[in-house]
Amino acid sequence: MNIMNTEQSQNTIVSRIKAFEGQTNTEIPGLPKKPEIIPRTIPPKPAVSSGKPLVAPKPAANRASGEWDTWAENRLKVTSREGLTPYSSPQEAGITPVTKPELPKKPTPGLTRSVNHETSGGRPMAESPDTGKKIPTPAPRPLLPKKSASTDAPPYPSIPPKLVSAPPRLSVASQAKAFRSLGEGLPSNPPVPAPQSKALGDIDLISFDDDVLPTSGSPAEEPTGSETVLDPFQLPTKTEATKERAVQPAPTRKPTVIRIPAKPGKCLHEEPQSPPPLPAEKPVGNTHSAVSGRPSHSDRTRNPELEQASESGGLVQGPPRLPPRPVHGKVIPVWRPPPKGAPERPPPPKLPASKSSNKNLPFNRSSSDMDLQKKQSHFVSGLSKAKSQIFKNQDPVLPPRPKPGHPLYRKYMLSVPHGIANEDIVSRNPTELSCKRGDVLVILKQAENNYLECQRGEGTGRVHPSQMKIVTPLDERPRGRPNDSGHSQKPVDSGAPHAVALHDFPAEQADDLSLTSGEIVYLLEKIDAEWYRGKCRNQTGVFPANYVKVIVDIPEGRSGKRESFSSHCAKGPRCVARFEYIGDQKDELSFSEGEVIILTEYVNEEWGRGEIRDRSGIFPLNFVELVGDHPTSGANILSTKVPPKTKNEDPGSNSQDSSPPGEWCKALHSFTAETSEDLPFKRGDRILILERLDSDWYRGRLHDREGIFPAVFVQPCPAEAKGVASAIPKGRKVKALYDFLGENEDELSFKAGDVITELEPIDDAWMRGELMGRAGMFPKNYVQFLQVS
């Protein structure tokens, strides 16, 4: 019975092989006819995980010809032959109940024979029936592990480009036919090899069949025929190629993309990883656009949306930021003045060709421009180098020492060991010092042979004591300081208010005056019973009264000792010396910083005549600061000279007769009042300045209304410039708002905070003034007028 059963099983296998051959000739249309192979392949589904990767590349190369289906069938049979026969036997039992117990064993050798023959011979199915009897069973088994090994370790690195190139070889029409035939046959006849492909986890070739299998309603109907249609005998000729190509699909995703129509899920997962090749592969399969084209398109659109979202995320954060908020808030330029940046330099003034006075000659731009052009032609550095040379000439490195009779002499030299040369000294050797009669020689140390090491300017040398008159010897420096300072009072006024410091007082505030025990302090003002304001060592400040011994106190009038001084101050204007001035001529009045001068007469716009106690003389007005109003009665010269200049001011401006100190300004911008104290105005309005609250705010009057307004919104009127020029004798001054560095020799350089005595207007943008003995021109927008109290 066993022999009969084996013969019957072999006959059935031969008949099935013939059926396979017939179906391969008819290609795909014959797939639904043979349902017999399905029971064999379905059970091996979970077990054939190892052989699956080999199948994927084959169908990719020959999809249109239909060999892909035969290769899948062959793979399914080979896997069933390795150990999946127990699963295939029950399915065959369902089809042929007589052979159920016997078929599980023999279909497996039959399949292995056919596969063996195919792999070894590579011939068509016609030879398979004969070879099925001759080929032994164990031969095909080692082939499968070889295939799996090849898949695990691909030896051919050049195979992936072959796979990519294989799909385009087929025409679009043939591929479309293959997909259509597969799409039509697969739903009706779901091939069993598909479940095996899922278990194997191979590339999308098998997954394509897997998707087709679930579409079939019943696996028991014609699926067996579909498996028989897949010819395992045609595959042997391409077995080796499939091994090579089986390795290829794993690294490359293009075969997966081609089979996207069968597996929309994988398309969605894999397309975003390789977006560039997709557009070219869309037309290869019609089902791709129908089934998986949509999700792939959604993925493509999804990515740019995400990118836009990520990019827009930064943009979205921009709008909510603070910049848009101030737009709806208070307008900044209306109330707040612009940042204090130095204004632009105005163009040089256009001066008339002829000048009426010699004082304007230095400001002739043509001469300075010619000098600058010469400097630029001679020096590569140009103007910058010329500037440095100019300033170096203006500021000598070491001025000569004050000589006896100079007000600075007693303050700066009496405490220093020094002497005065009695005769002209000509050095006979390099160690001696040459000097002229009257030069002040600073004594450095005692030299050998009874000589003294002295210094004159930057030169040092030896001088014999017989050639000089020693004023402060080396060993009397501590004693001579207080005595000398006491002597220094006599030439000025021995009765001037002063005191002697009893204790050292270190300054703790910016306006404090540091004192050392024994120093003499000039008393300028008595603040209260406990504090004085005084001057010492060319410094002015406040100090406590209990730290000094008052020698001559300040009278209650706080103007000085003598009644005549107080009466004069009540009658006429007073000036406070801003700098020390030493007269070069006998008719000049010398004074120290902080001293109060009675202004008795204006000699001209630059010079005035004044009195300090019992001394009188002329002095430059730019060295003093006017602190008293001009009296209606007082010095005749003052009353005769000032009123005409005030009258000249009146025609320049309509309402300047109200008060000489009043200034007019012109609005550069419109100003809207934000508080009840603000003074609104429009651009071009002329405003009378009543008070300067600080450097940024003024109080003014416009149309019978008073209020405060920002200084940066206005500028002095051109007519005011002329008035100011004529008011210079009254002590009109300007204060520097910014640092200004002159670019030409005729320009006046200054720093912010300097007070300049303005002497003459040049034009609407420039004026001429003096500062610390230097005269020059400067731009008006760098300064502001100071209120005259």
Swiss-Prot record:
Phosphoserine PTM sites in chain numbering: 65, 368
Residue span, SH3 domain: 414-476, 494-553, 570-629, 660-719, 729-788
GO biological process, any: cytoskeleton organization
Broad class of the protein's primary localization: cytoplasm
Tissue specificity: Expressed in hair follicles.
Cytoplasm as UniProt keyword: yes
Compositional bias per record (Pro residues), positions renumbered to this chain: 335-351
Low complexity compositional bias, start-end: 352-361
Biased composition (Basic and acidic residues): 296-305, 474-484
Region (Disordered), start-end ranges: 24-170, 209-404, 472-497, 635-663
Subunit annotation: Interacts with ADAM12. Isoform 2 (but not isoform 1) interacts with ADAM9, ADAM10, ADAM15 and ADAM17. Interacts with SH3GL1 SH3 domain. Interacts via SH3 3 and SH3 4 or SH3 4 and SH3 5 domains with SOS2. Probably forms a trimeric complex with SH3GL1 and SOS2. Interacts with SH3YL1.
Biological role stated in the UniProt entry: May play a role in regulating A disintegrin and metalloproteases (ADAMs) in the signaling of EGFR-ligand shedding. May be involved in suppression of Ras-induced cellular transformation and Ras-mediated activation of ELK1. Plays a role in the regulation of cell morphology and cytoskeletal organization.
Name assigned to this protein: SH3 domain-containing protein 19
Gene, per the UniProt record: Sh3d19
